[in-house]
């Protein structure tokens, strides 16, 4: 079906990409991201640098790509600018050293910002596909992300045609791109599993300048679901949701869940699946990770909408081998739809995300260690946290064997404000912040979520801090952080 396209090796295709090009990669997490071109671009960068020639690209993605891909590009000094999210230790180091400019963005907003030209033109899009048609139809793979927008906006398109993916993966896709304001219609999704688009992206076939054939799996996440800390946090989340059901604040049929990525979220989903009182439920999320596949198999999750399948190769193969079952139970959408505030609010999504630190008034820091060093980025947590029916943030109460408290007097960086964070949960307990004044919130967070070794300090801070509606001692508000920098421990 795609025989008219020019076949190239990855190294040949990388020659198309020039110094300072804006390059856009498909995918959302490692799912659906290019597998061959990142290494080829890094090789080209190394060759150019050895010849004393400049060569760096500006790189747009959906969310993260595989850490290995970002690492190889970072090691080759091949990236000068990056947005909107990353999980690579090598790239993170370059960002925090100031060697790479990084723009941290709400994931739902990236496509619109590109459409309005805020970042300039996309010179080359590198898109993983499962199939092509001569008329320019492109079928995507296990992660949709911003690929539809990249395909439409890019001047040139390089396709990685990945034969690893079952062609039926296209049955999971639901591709729709909202119009531009002020003539943007509502997105007619009234149920988590509603389909409103097509299974492919239609583009001008003349833009496809190369096809690189691959047969490579996604780099799946390895998660430790047996972590006792994660299990206790998960138990507390389930306890809270059961209480909400008992009080009639969650209906008997439950509400759609959004769950972020990582060990805590994976443990929460597993615990929800094990609890007999929690009814079968839907997901309206940005990623589907490992535990979701099992819950779809058992029927505990009756349907799941997301932008990607961030799962192991074994679980992805299980889905491909049982598409007659899974095709009606999974929908993959562009991230401006999976993370769309309008839909999140309409469906009454319960958002479950992890933070780095919280302050005693309920602000949350998801991105910057000690307020300065980027970890990964805000990702989609803000899209859901600001618009969900219930915004729940989770974290261990301490890190590094107690040297760091997750609960502090004032966050060193704020991604999510007190006006949106509804519930904070650690392994210590649950802080329901709804309807509480600032001082009530502070005492609730300290008593229920802070680790016992830090509670006395936090209570003393609150009692001694001057103020009116909110109490803060600006002379000592960051003493814990200063101690950490000076001694390696917040308590000094």
UniProtKB/Swiss-Prot annotation:
Task performed by this protein: Catalyzes the transfer of coenzyme A from propionyl-CoA to succinate. Could be part of a pathway that converts succinate to propionate.
Protein EC: 2.8.3.27
Catalytic activity: propanoyl-CoA + succinate = propanoate + succinyl-CoA
Coiled coil region boundaries: none
Bilayer-crossing regions: none
Underlying gene: scpC
InterPro entries given in the database record: AcetylCoA_hyd_C (IPR026888), AcetylCoA_hyd_C_sf (IPR038460), ActCoA_hydro (IPR046433), ActCoA_hydro_N (IPR003702), NagB/RpiA_transferase-like (IPR037171), Succinate_CoA_transferase (IPR017821)
A GO MF label: acetate CoA-transferase activity
Domain of life the protein comes from: Bacteria
Keyword presence, Oxidoreductase: no
Protein name: Propanoyl-CoA:succinate CoA transferase
Positions of the catalytic residues: 286 (5-glutamyl coenzyme a thioester intermediate)
Annotated residues for binding of CoA: 260-264, 376, 380
Gene3D superfamilies: Acetyl-CoA hydrolase/transferase C-terminal domain, Glutaconate Coenzyme A-transferase
Keywords from the named record: Transferase
Family stated for the protein in its record: Belongs to the acetyl-CoA hydrolase/transferase family.
One Pfam family, short name: AcetylCoA_hydro
Enzyme class: transferase
Gene Ontology biological process terms from the UniProt entry: acetate metabolic process; acetyl-CoA metabolic process
